[in-house]
């Protein structure tokens, strides 16, 4: 228990706001995070590359991933069209008590300066279409097609991670619930701001779930905290950004890295991103798998019901760092 409390403190103890703003390569040269080309026929090579990137960085990009370029274009089109609607129309899918729905965060302070749309994608039993925009009319069709591709890609990556760490291919997929694992989309809309050195589009955080797959538009802004500094990530056109979350880190007893990351707004250009978060069911127990623990490597984390983990992590965040969802 003591180890768990200590590590949870480190998970939720984010760099101070001054550190977040000062220690950054923003405006300088972006760094190249690992890139994995899925068109490579040598699957053993892909397994090694995915594991290495997840252990050393906790974030990487995949190219030639099989998601049609036209579908990605349509996804960006319908998302942009939604945020261009009048506020009154966007408010028809506004948040109520749950995290789902539309929200605008321009409330002063520097964190979470954005608008966003949040809703569940899968499994079908948890989808609430009242939070899916009816305008633009193609939104649902495009998003459902995109979900199919993202699920296939997620399961491929989880399978490679499992195999690369000496597990059965389905281990990580089944450990987060298999077909009942929850997929959630958040469309982030970061408008231009002249106060780029004073405003953070999305505050520094690690993802609470297992893994996230993200597509941004062409405007840079995603940053990762590595080697005691914030690094701007150089995005490759049509790539998918893969981000390792807390639960894969916990299941592997710390072997995989849950990367701390944030989003910055641009001075002149609109930035939009489409992360899909993949997480266990709320009632699932998640903790170190036996393959990663032993007499010389005791569990670093307590096995917790996922919903309890969420509550514990949120309580550990400072109010100013709390994501607004």
Curated annotation (Swiss-Prot):
Q: Where is this region: Disordered?
A: 1-21
Q: Summarize where 2-oxoglutarate binds, as residue positions.
A: 188-190, 271-273
Q: Which domain of life is it from?
A: Eukaryota
Any note on cofactor binding? Binds 1 Fe(2+) ion per subunit.
What cofactors does the UniProt entry give for this protein? Answer: Fe(2+)
The reply to whether Repeat figures as a keyword in the UniProt entry is no
Q: Name one Pfam family in it.
A: DIOX_N
Top enzyme class? oxidoreductase
Residue spans with biased composition (Polar residues)? 10-21
Which tissues and organs express this gene's product? Expressed in young seedlings.
- Pathway named in the protein's UniProt entry: Secondary metabolite biosynthesis; flavonoid biosynthesis
Catalysed reactions listed for this entry? a (2R,3R)-dihydroflavonol + 2-oxoglutarate + O2 = a flavonol + succinate + CO2 + H2O
Q: What is the deletion mutant like?
A: No visible phenotype under normal growth conditions.
Q: Which residues bind Fe cation?
A: 205, 207, 261
Single GO MF annotation: flavonol synthase activity
What keywords appear on the UniProt entry? Iron, Metal-binding, Oxidoreductase
Per UniProt, residues of the Fe2OG dioxygenase domain are 180-280
Give the EC number(s) under which this enzyme is classified. 1.14.20.6
- Record-stated family: Belongs to the iron/ascorbate-dependent oxidoreductase family.
Output this protein's name: Probable flavonol synthase 5
Which species does this protein come from?
Arabidopsis thaliana
């Amino acid at each position: 228990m003591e180890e768990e409390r200590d590590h949870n403190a480190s998970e939720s103890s984010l760099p101070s706001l001054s550190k977040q703003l000062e220690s950054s390569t923003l405006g300088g040269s972006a760094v190249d995070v690992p890139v994995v080309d899925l068109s490579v026929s040598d699957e053993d090579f892909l397994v090694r590359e995915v594991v290495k990137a997840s252990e050393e960085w906790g974030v990487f990009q995949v190219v030639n991933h099989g998601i049609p370029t036209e579908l990605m274009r349509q996804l960006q089109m319908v998302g942009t069209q939604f945020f261009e609607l009048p506020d009154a129309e966007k408010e028809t899918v506004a948040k109520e008590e749950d995290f789902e729905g539309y929200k605008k965060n321009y409330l002063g302070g520097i964190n979470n300066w954005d608008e966003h749309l949040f809703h569940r994608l899968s499994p079908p039993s948890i989808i609430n279409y009242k939070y899916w925009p009816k305008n633009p009319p193609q939104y649902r069709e495009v998003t459902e097609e995109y979900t199919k591709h993202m699920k296939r890609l997620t399961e491929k990556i989880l399978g490679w991670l499992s195999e690369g760490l000496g597990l059965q291919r389905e281990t990580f997929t089944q450990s987060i619930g298999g077909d009942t694992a929850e997929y959630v989309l958040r469309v982030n809309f970061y408008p231009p701001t002249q106060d780029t050195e004073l405003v953070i589009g999305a505050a520094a955080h690690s993802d609470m779930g297992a893994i996230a797959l993200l597509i941004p538009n062409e405007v840079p802004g995603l940053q990762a905290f590595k080697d005691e500094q914030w690094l701007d990530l150089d995005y490759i056109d049509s790539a998918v950004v893969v981000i390792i979350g807390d639960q894969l880190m916990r299941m592997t007893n710390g072997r995989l890295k849950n990367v701390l990351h944030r989003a910055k707004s641009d001075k002149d250009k609109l930035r939009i991103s489409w992360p899909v978060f993949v997480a266990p069911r709320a009632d699932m127990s998640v903790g170190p798998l036996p393959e990663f623990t032993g007499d010389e490597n005791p569990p670093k984390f307590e096995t917790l019901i996922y919903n309890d983990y969420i509550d514990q992590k949120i309580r550990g965040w400072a109010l100013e760092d709390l994501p607004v969802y």
